[in-house]
Swiss-Prot record:
Gene3D superfamilies: P-loop containing nucleotide triphosphate hydrolases (3.40.50.300). One of its GO terms (biological process) is response to antibiotic. Keywords: Antibiotic resistance, ATP-binding, Cell membrane, Membrane, Nucleotide-binding, Translocase, Transport. It catalyses: daunorubicin(in) + ATP + H2O = daunorubicin(out) + ADP + phosphate + H(+). This is Daunorubicin resistance ATP-binding protein DrrA3. Belongs to the ABC transporter superfamily. Drug exporter-1 (DrugE1) (TC 3.A.1.105) family. It is an enzyme of class 7 (translocase). SMART domains: AAA. The gene is drrA3.
């Protein structure tokens, strides 16, 4: 389909007895950011390697920009860029020299490679540092330069495999801004990440992957709705009163975080739940430091969908 940049039907990949991809299905619309979330070992990096033709699938129909990744691997490579988890830069060279080198490796002529390097340095706000060696760059600057290198050939589809791992908040924000500008220019981005905030900030749609399969897909708001919509959080003054509060509050599905003296539960009628909780606590003489309504976070969605909630326990 003309409006679909990536099509995956029934992708399978084995490593010995382990299925890294187990019948995975995926659709990514052209000109969007599609986030792929999942715990370690879920199959995210294997998926990126298959889509970028670095790894041959065992089964399935997989197309990128209308080309089959097995039968038309070369055509796929001409249309994609890849930013892996580890930087592919020469620290002894300057930023401009690195980009020129990537250009020559992609068979650009010397003049075109220099021009493209200058374009990308300007685009990623690195023009003033182009002569500095990469060793002198901050983490965020290195990652932006690495991202620029992946765009030397002006790809239709860009794969970002955990692009901000190890960066501080400032560095992550710099990369996020760069990704937003790419999509504004029409590039399709497939983003794998372990930062839930990153997917919430960048992704138009999100696929949650576990055990080699997509177990949920939608916008961030759609996925958050799957955990029960709105939630109410109650922070008590005394942790010792958590059990009593759970027993008397007019709520179901309550979770308890003892360290934070926090009770949390899904609600359907926001105002009725809020007034009911405040009234019940007052009548029982239980002091609350804070009572608030909120939407569920993407972290809670992730833990709920993957069954990996180790931080909170269902109240008995």
């Amino acid at each position: 389909m003309a409006d679909t940049a990536i099509t995956v039907d029934g992708a399978e990949k084995r490593y010995g007895d382990k299925k890294a991809l187990d019948g995975l299905d995926l659709r990514v619309a052209r000109g969007t950011v599609h986030g792929v979330l999942g715990p370690n070992g879920a199959g995210k990096t294997t998926l990126v390697r298959v889509l970028s033709t670095l790894l041959r699938p065992d089964a399935g129909r997989i197309e990128v920009s209308g080309h089959d990744v097995v039968r038309e691997a070369y055509a796929v490579r001409l249309r994609i860029g890849l930013l892996g988890q580890h930087a592919a830069l020469d620290e002894e060279l300057g930023g401009r020299q690195n980009l020129e080198l990537f250009g020559r490796l992609h068979h650009l002529g010397a003049r075109r490679a220099r021009a493209r390097a200058d374009e990308l340095l300007e685009r990623f706000d690195l023009a003033d540092t182009g002569r500095k060696t990469v060793r002198q760059y901050s983490g965020g600057m290195r990652r932006r330069l690495d991202l620029a290198a992946s765009l030397i050939t002006e790809p239709e589809v860009l794969f970002l495999d955990e692009p901000t791992t190890g960066l501080d908040p400032r560095g992550r924000a710099e990369v996020w801004d760069s990704v937003r500008s790419l999509v504004g220019g029409g590039t399709t981005v497939l983003l794998t990440t372990q930062y839930l905030e990153e997917a919430d900030q960048l992704a138009d749609r999100i696929s949650v992957v576990d055990a080699g399969r997509v177990i949920a897909e939608g916008t961030a708001d759609e996925l958050k709705a799957e955990t029960g919509g709105d939630r109410i959080d109650v922070v008590l003054r005394e942790a010792g009163q958590l059990g009593a509060a759970v027993a008397l509050l007019p709520l179901t599905g309550v979770t308890v975080d003892t360290d934070r003296r926090l009770l949390s539960a899904p609600v359907t009628d926001r105002m009725e739940a809020l007034s009911g909780v405040v009234r019940a606590l007052q009548e029982a003489g239980i002091e609350a430091e804070d009572v608030a309504l909120r939407r569920p976070t993407l972290d809670e969605v992730f833990l709920h969908l993957t069954g990996d909630d180790r931080r909170v326990k269902e109240a008995a």
